[in-house]
Amino acid sequence: MSTDPKDSAAALEDTIARYNEAWNAHDLDAIIAMHAPDMVFANHTAGESASGAEVRAHIGSIFETWPDIAFSTRRLYVRDGLVVQEWTATATHANEMRRGDLVAEPTGKTISWNGLDVIPFEDGSVKRKDVYSDSVSILRQLGLL
């Protein structure tokens, strides 16, 4: 567990609020600035992982597929060095979506789904982001299941 004051639970409450604001603003520069250089972004639901410089392109592809995506935090758990948050996303499927071998053409449907992030911090920066979301709900709402 980190002993850096920037990783204290009190500091991380402010940090995660700014991080979530950057995601909702689709501000890639602000998001990336809050990541450690060797940060890992793992979307376990989609079976995708990116690290280092790949993370910008990966997050950019999320904003491209879902250009109006917005997240609301349902529950937030913060302790020294770690944030776990449950969220609901609402977005319009405006561009191609890839999930492994599945390629879904844009449907124009606006849908909502739930997810959970596990975010360890190091030196005040996001060290990794493990994302778990309800892909069955996404695929059903898009008419793909």
Where are these regions (language model features)?
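A short gly/proline-enriched turn/hairpin at secondary-structure junctions
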Residues: T3, M34, M39-A50, I62-W66
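A beta-strand edge to alpha-helix "cap/lid" segment located at domain peripheries
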Residues: S2-A11, D27-A30, R56, G60-L145
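Hydrophobic alpha-helical segments and helix-packing faces
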Residues: L12, N24, I32, E48-V55
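Structured beta->alpha junctions
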Residues: N20, T45-G47, R75-Y77
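Short, aromatic-enriched amphipathic alpha-helices that serve as compact interaction elements
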Residues: S8-H26, M34
